[in-house]
Design a protein with these regions (language model features):
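N-terminal capping/small domains of soluble enzymes
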Residues: 1-108, 158, 169
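Short, solvent-exposed loop/turn and secondary-structure capping segments
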Residues: 36, 112-116, 200-201
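Short beta-strand segments at enzyme active-site cores
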Residues: 61-65, 101-105, 183-198
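Generic structural signal for helix capping and beta-alpha/helix-loop junctions
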Residues: 70, 110-113, 197-198
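Short, hinge-like loop/turn segments at secondary-structure boundaries
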Residues: 79-81, 119-122, 207
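Aromatic/hydrophobic pocket-lining residues that form π-stacking "cages" and hydrophobic walls in ligand
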Residues: 90, 176, 205
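Non-globular sequence segments
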Residues: 100, 106-183
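Conserved small/polar residues in nucleotide/adenosyl-binding loops
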Residues: 205-211
Length: 211
């Protein structure tokens, strides 16, 4: 091996977690461990891919980002106890490789949520939106820090999250992170403080006058 690459194979630390080498697979679409745009569950196909990366000496693996609340159906991740049980049963096999697993948690898309024509109609027609709400609550998943135009359909405004909704989300991050820790996950990364996703305007550009 060329000596200039030797540093890639030395250990390093994030907090108190030591990672065996400097090879990292970052989060990317299609690798979410708990499913994506569907009711949350332990995704065996994603788990197979993640385990395969670890078996090929990737020191740190981050599955695709995971919203703390299901886009479809609106269930909070922490409410699915079976999913965390399945994760805990799988993780010992993953950890046999010596690799570490961090899970990327997200508050959601906010005004950057891509919406189609049906979703636009659900936003513009309150009765239609109410009918679809148990399956897809478009009003909630497009809500943002302030009343701002949707990134992809500026004719629709994202409503501001209520203070109660914000506190619910903060609580969900804490509960989900604790369940991940209890299952054996090595770390949590907070996703999406960029590109207008929900935590971006909350952190930087919101127009709110309270708290």
């Amino acid at each position: 091996m060329n000596e200039k690459y030797s540093a890639l194979f030395t250990p390093w630390k994030i907090g108190n977690v030591e990672i065996k080498n400097r090879i990292v697979q970052p989060s990317m679409g299609g690798t979410s461990l708990f499913g994506w745009l569907e009711p949350c569950h332990f995704d065996k196909e994603a788990a197979y891919h993640i385990l395969n990366r670890a078996q090929n000496n990737v020191g740190l693996v981050l599955p695709g980002m995971q919203c703390v609340r299901d886009t479809m159906g609106g269930r909070w991740l922490y409410q699915n106890k079976k999913m965390f049980k399945d994760l805990a049963e799988w993780l010992p096999e993953f950890h046999k490789t010596g690799s570490k697993l961090f899970v990327q948690l997200s508050a959601g898309m906010g005004r950057s949520m891509a919406i189609n024509e049906i979703m636009v109609k659900m936003l513009q027609n309150k009765a239609f939106g109410a009918v679809g709400k148990p399956f897809l609550n478009v009003d909630y998943i497009t809500a943002s820090a302030s009343a701002t135009p949707n990134r992809w359909y500026p004719e629709c405004k994202s409503r501001p999250l209520t203070v109660e909704e914000i506190h619910e989300m903060v609580d969900a991050f804490a509960k989900t992170a604790k369940l991940l820790q209890d299952a054996g996950v090595d770390g949590v990364e907070i996703h999406a403080v960029h590109e207008g996703y929900l935590l971006d305007p909350v952190s930087y550009t919101h127009l709110r006058a309270h708290e």
